[in-house]
From Swiss-Prot:
Database matches in PANTHER family: HID-1 FAMILY PROTEIN P19A11.07C, PROTEIN HID1
Cytoplasm recorded as keyword: yes
Gene Ontology, cellular component aspect: cytosol; Golgi medial cisterna; Golgi trans cisterna; membrane; nucleus
Family: Belongs to the hid-1 family.
Domain of life where this protein originates: Eukaryota
Subcellular localization, as worded in the UniProt entry: Cytoplasm; Nucleus
Transmembrane stretches, start-end: none
Keywords noted in UniProt: Cytoplasm, Nucleus
Protein name stated in the entry: Hid-1 family protein P19A11.07c
Length: 688
């Protein structure tokens, strides 16, 4: 929007539409003026939306929203006839909806109204509004199936517009080229989108993420997935294919210079919102509808058809393109730490997005991990993941990023061929600067991962899983510096560790089992480890000397008082825990460890006495459970919210200032045009 007079007119029109009976002149101006994102965020104030939403003037807000939806559906329905004549009506409708929806989701009453409206039949809605629309000079002739709801109609039209010639893709683009960016499925686009097309793509990707953001205003136990369910259950296979290719390519793969440097902010917005949308869609492997909407409180599981289609991605070259692009982002923190290159802006930009996408690929795309065997930079990817996981493990602000890197690394080393590839020494790899966290890198990546993780303070289950996977899968190779892992094993075998929780006990068991498995299968190359164990065998007391009966007695005396035993006050939970620990001790392979501490090192007794108890190989993979999905969803939204509120690029945050319920929000300032001193003075003079 250009002149000050136009800004004043738009501000007055918005106030009139919210506070007075709808008038033709007001609506005509709202949907014909030239609006920008900053105009909408600056002149449709949060307090105005809330006042209207929470008063008897809510109907005005509801009418404005419904007209925006009708504009989008009707213009898309007859695009060739109405575009570009009604271009501003289409763009302004998306902009206004993007601004209004978070505040409607924020309130329980208005959120319920939106949900009811979305589920209502579209044709019926048009019929109900005809008298009012006639007064406003709005006439809609839309051809849609009678069964379409308002939300389905809106989503269908939005997705159609995402790949509409002349709006988001070039009018010269072939059917195969009607996606946003080159990458998977199509390596090159002969007629790439123009500057305006990119603007429209950015607008639509932002709107789709905002549409999904209703879960931001739900408690963690009562998440409403109605919008998401509608998105993933559309009968639109061709559209889904374009959505996957466009949003994946734009968010993670296409690194070409679309425009001049002055357009970097818009490019950044498009890239981020594209990556966020595809991540949010693919994150929900087991979608469950809001339970409190049903009388029995159980809800209904709905299949994610878009994810199912994504799982059918099968071309090796596509997987390798994705892996290469993700790894470029993941390498930024380590390169920055080593100061190999100079970064403009935040070097962590898109690292979380890439980690989350990689995590979803490794857990929900069956073929991706197998295809990484053909990825020449798999060792580099492991090193990057290790650095991110360890470097930011103690940083509360980056705990999600650290955990994602750990899960991804665990999944990579659950593949035996990738572990074997990681055993080859490659000193050309960029490694972390030597520090208390990272020793000098003079070995293979697989051994280096073990060295680093074994020296962490208070390792988590992720670290134990990673170490165990490597030890179970590593080929015959000497472990030169065994002190860190011996120290770690002696630590986890202390009663104060394994008695603290069953999870700790499980971590102790998996670490000891994998270590013994490694020794048995690499005995001749690792005699120095046997010698080290024997030298430090006192570190494994008292557990190494206990029989099963002695362990049971220890458990009882440590956890159950004598008076409780005498009076029969031990509850079933206590008895169950005792049985669990007794079985745990029985399966702990103490006899094998005891043998390692006493045997001669001049021959391999495990070969000569095959009847001795052996260790069963077990690989610990990441399973995308409901709990992990919920954790991921909450953290994705927390990251999106933080990025849009604090991002230096100036991307406006649609949710800024709203009362989010999904997680705790720290007070931050929005670095957008709203912080401009001149604009603040301008608003103060005109709108106070």
């Amino acid at each position: 929007m250009g002149s000050a007079e136009s800004k004043i007119s738009f501000r007055h029109a918005i106030l009139a539409s919210l506070n007075t009976k709808p008038e033709r002149e007001i609506y005509e101006f709202l949907f014909t003026c030239n609006l920008t994102e900053n105009d909408v965020f600056s002149f449709i104030l949060a307090q105005d939306i809330r006042i209207c939403r929470d008063s008897n003037k809510f109907d005005n807000l509801a009418i404005l929203l419904q007209v925006c939806v009708l504009n989008i559906v009707s213009i898309q329905n007859k695009f060739s006839e109405q575009y570009p004549l009604k271009k501003n009506a289409l763009l302004n409708s998306f902009l206004i909806l993007t601004r209004l929806l978070p505040y409607l989701y924020e309130s329980t009453n208005s959120s319920n109204w939106v949900r009811t409206y979305f589920q209502k039949d579209f044709s019926q809605t048009v019929d109900d509004l005809k008298p009012l629309l006639s007064e406003l000079g709005l006439n809609y002739e839309i051809e849609l199936p009678n069964s379409f709801s308002n939300l389905t109609s809106l989503l269908s039209s939005t997705f159609q517009l995402c790949f509409q010639h002349e709006f988001t893709v070039s009018k010269y683009a072939s059917s195969e080229e009607s996606i946003w960016s080159a990458g998977i499925a199509i390596p090159e686009i002969a007629h790439p989108p123009s500057y305006d097309h990119r603007l429209h793509q950015s607008l639509l990707s932002c709107f789709l993420v905002v549409l999904l953001s209703n879960t931001l205003y739900d408690s963690i136990d009562e998440l409403d997935f109605s919008v998401l369910n509608s998105i993933v259950s559309l009968d639109a296979k061709d559209i889904y294919i374009r959505v996957i290719c466009s949003f994946v390519n734009t968010g993670f793969i296409d690194s070409t210079n679309w425009f001049l440097n002055s357009f970097n902010q818009r490019r950044n917005s498009l890239q981020l919102y594209s990556s966020w949308f595809i991540i949010l869609i693919l994150s929900d492997a087991r979608i469950k509808e809001n339970t409190h909407l049903y009388a029995n409180g159980e809800g209904q599981h709905i299949k994610n058809h878009l994810l199912e289609l994504f799982k059918k991605l099968h071309r090796t070259q596509d997987f390798l393109i994705i892996a290469e692009s993700i790894n470029k982002f993941l390498s930024n923190p380590l390169k920055k730490e080593r100061q190999i290159i100079t970064f403009m802006g935040d070097f962590k930009r898109c690292v979380v997005e890439s980690l989350c996408f990689l995590f979803l690929l490794l857990t929900n795309q069956p073929r991706f991990t197998d295809e990484l065997v053909n990825f020449k930079s798999s060792n580099e990817m492991m090193m990057n993941l290790l650095f991110i996981h360890v470097k930011y493990s103690g940083d509360t602000e980056n705990s999600y990023m650290s955990s994602l890197a750990g899960y991804c690394l665990q999944q990579l080393v659950s593949h035996e061929k990738l572990v074997k590839a990681a055993c080859h020494i490659d000193k050309s790899l960029i490694s972390p600067s030597p520090s208390s966290q990272f020793p000098v890198f003079d070995t293979s990546v697989a051994i280096y991962v073990i060295q680093v993780l074994c020296t962490l303070e208070n390792p988590s289950s992720i670290e134990y899983n990673i170490i165990s996977n490597i030890l179970f899968s590593i080929p015959t190779i000497p472990l030169k510096n065994a002190s860190p892992i011996v120290e770690l094993i002696s630590y986890v075998m202390k009663p104060e560790f394994f008695m603290k929780s069953q999870q700790n006990a499980s971590d102790c068991k998996k670490l000891l089992s994998s270590f013994l498995y490694f020794l048995i299968n690499n005995f001749n190359d690792n005699l120095h480890i046997i010698e080290l164990l024997q030298k430090d065998k006192r570190k494994f007391e008292p557990i190494i000397a206990w029989s099963e009966t002695e362990f049971s007695e220890f458990f009882v005396t440590s956890n159950i008082s004598q008076s409780a035993l005498d009076n029969g006050l031990v509850d079933q939970a206590g008895l169950d825990e005792q049985k669990w620990y007794e079985k745990w001790f029985h399966d702990l392979n103490i006899p094998l460890l005891r043998k390692c501490l006493t045997l001669r090192t001049d021959k391999n007794p495990f070969i000569e006495q095959p009847d001795e108890p052996n260790v069963t190989k077990k690989i610990y993979r990441v399973t995308y459970t409901d709990a992990l999905q919920r954790w991921n969803l909450v953290n994705i939204w927390r990251h999106i919210f933080k990025e849009t509120v604090t991002l230096n690029s100036g991307i406006s945050c649609p949710w800024y200032g709203t009362n989010v319920k999904l997680f705790t929000v720290r007070e931050v300032r929005q670095p957008t045009i709203l912080q401009s001193r001149s604009l603040g003075e301008f608003q103060g003079r005109l709108f106070s």
